[in-house]
């Protein structure tokens, strides 16, 4: 225990977490700090430098804790599961304050890494106009798992169906819940997580990628809502994770995953200040058929911004052709480049090109594109 000091003081300090990829400690952003001494309690949040100053003064050294309830509007569950937010009790220390460096492999490292990636994602949303995930987002971190998911089950009000021998248990197994399937299935919706993050064996950089992937799904949910997500979940239940690219709602799933995977990788590269302009997508195709390469190319070649792509992920966009049609509708002057981003990556749109107003251009492309009878709605 650190020595007491005379007089009332407002405790302050800095909380950092170790980035084992960069080899340095980085601030833990926006997390709640709680101080108490018997019946006196005080809370505040760290700033973007990881620094905090308590609102209340203490004459004697209080007990310090980090509570993973972030000022941006999300909670992280961990050691207490759905009962309470994850927290790190730091013990009794001086009333001058207490600082903590959270090392890789230590008790709270996973929570701090997930916290920072989520904080940065919310900040990106504020800067770009991409919708944030739904309010009061619940993220449950599992330190021994390697899989993650964004089921959003507590927010889905539409029926979820499945075909064949699939069931809720199969669904949970398919997205990595394993032996917890039965327990989670019986929990009330209000205590189900929106997102699960598996951090087992992951570096800080990998956690950053995975968290941004899942949060991109949550932003997608904010725009399309329950009915769309029920179809997404039904596909997972029926075909097992991503399936093989066939079956009902396969392209709906493919669109969601091309957005999620590419956003995870793009955000990760931006955080580490690595340009993707001259970097061909090198992560492979999830399940062999999903093509994050499309969104990656649209961004790295500055054809469309992340926000412009996001604006096309609306209700009714549940096939590749409908996605292309929406992009053509919004950005007709980029139609040729948009088409190329798809065809270069193995997806051939069957959508008519828009009339750009350029007679020479339109005349040249009239016979190039296969006409489509599909009507976008």
Regions found by a protein language model. Give the residues of each.
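Pan-zinc metallopeptidase signature
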Residues: 276-377
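Short, ordered, surface-exposed loop/turn motifs in non-cytosolic proteins
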Residues: 10-39
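Active-site recognition of the HExxH zinc-binding catalytic motif
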Residues: 209-226, 257-261, 265
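Zn2+-dependent metallopeptidase catalytic core
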Residues: 55-57, 72, 98-168
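Short Pro-Gly-centered beta-turn/loop motif in secreted/extracellular proteins
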Residues: 27, 53-63
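Short pre-active-site segment immediately N-terminal to the catalytic Zn-binding motif
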Residues: 194-211, 251
